[in-house]
Amino acid sequence: QLFDQVVKGFPTWLKLDKKENPVQFKIQVWHAEHRIGFPWSEIRNISFNDKKFVIKPIDKKAPDFVFYAPRRKPDTIEVQQMKLQDFEQKTK
């Protein structure tokens, strides 16, 4: 569960790499210096539902990799009003 320890509260990226061979792919999830890689040949299924991204390996005994994509929360009314005031001041 290295991934859970690494990414809590920090931005995380999901990347699909294509190697020189046109049929060889690799999925990488990383934050800062920590990287988790999945060769395409070892992935059985990939699914995404709302904020949950799941990678299932071919080895059924191996645990599924679950990645929760961060979503930006909508601005509160106070923040929206402050942004509107700032915009109005800049346009004057």
Curated annotation (Swiss-Prot):
Transmembrane intervals: none
Subcellular location, record wording: Apical cell membrane; Cell projection; Cell projection, Microvillus membrane; Cell projection, Ruffle membrane
Modification sites for N6-acetyllysine: K15
Tagged with keyword Hydrolase: no
Record Pfam families: FERM_C
Segments forming domain FERM: 1-72
GO molecular function: actin binding
UniProt PTM: Phosphorylated by tyrosine-protein kinases. Phosphorylation by ROCK2 suppresses the head-to-tail association of the N-terminal and C-terminal halves resulting in an opened conformation which is capable of actin and membrane-binding.
Free-text domain note: The [IL]-x-C-x-x-[DE] motif is a proposed target motif for cysteine S-nitrosylation mediated by the iNOS-S100A8/A9 transnitrosylase complex.
Subunit structure, as described in the record: Interacts with PALS1 and NHERF2. Found in a complex with EZR, PODXL and NHERF2. Interacts with MCC, PLEKHG6, PODXL, SCYL3/PACE1, NHERF1 and TMEM8B. Interacts (when phosphorylated) with FES/FPS. Interacts with dimeric S100P, the interaction may be activating through unmasking of F-actin binding sites. Identified in complexes that contain VIM, EZR, AHNAK, BFSP1, BFSP2, ANK2, PLEC, PRX and spectrin. Detected in a complex composed of at least EZR, AHNAK, PPL and PRX. Interacts with PDPN (via cytoplasmic domain); activates RHOA and promotes epithelial-mesenchymal transition.
Name of the protein in its database record: Ezrin
Gene: EZR
